[in-house]
């Protein structure tokens, strides 16, 4: 935690200057990360327990394990999905940024932290990218942990009637 807090503290002036876009991006990004997982798994015919296991894939394993208990999913599948998400994000993040021409370390870091909890990969870009990745990781985990257990009982009956 201290390893993530110190770089964030050093970038606090930058974070303060963009706090509104950070909050908006966190809510939209967390919703899309979970929503796309839910939709694709459902579209492919996955059972409710599998869909519920994949929903928290973009947050850290300890948080995902607790969240998946409220969705009725499998803890081991959720942990595997989290690991795969992190690995894929770390592997393809740099390529995606090059293809899209993203050079701003704040954006690169925040995107890696939000979507793939790839903090180490973000630190390879810069300390600023790592700080923003750590911030995104924490905020996305918080939003997902608070929202998904509350929203799942509303979403699940719609996707899996009867």
Q: Over which residues does each language-model region extend?
A:
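Short juxtamembrane and helix-loop transition motifs at transmembrane-helix boundaries
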Residues: 9-20, 41-47, 68-74, 96-102
């Amino acid at each position: 935690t201290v390893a993530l807090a110190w770089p964030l503290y050093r970038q606090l002036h930058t974070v303060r200057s963009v706090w509104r876009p950070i909050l908006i991006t966190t809510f939209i990004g967390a919703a899309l990360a979970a929503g796309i997982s839910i939709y694709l798994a459902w579209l492919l015919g996955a059972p409710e327990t599998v869909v519920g296991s994949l929903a928290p894939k973009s947050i850290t394993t300890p948080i995902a394990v607790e969240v998946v208990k409220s969705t009725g999913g499998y803890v081991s599948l959720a942990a595997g999905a989290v690991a795969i998400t992190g690995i894929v994000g770390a592997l393809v993040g740099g390529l995606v940024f090059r293809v899209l021409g993203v050079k701003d370390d704040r954006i690169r870091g925040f995107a890696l932290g939000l979507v793939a909890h790839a903090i180490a990969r973000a630190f390879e870009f810069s300390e600023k990218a790592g700080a923003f990745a750590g911030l995104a990781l924490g905020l996305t985990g918080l939003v997902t942990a608070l929202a998904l257990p509350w929203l799942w009982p509303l979403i699940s009956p719609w996707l899996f009637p009867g």
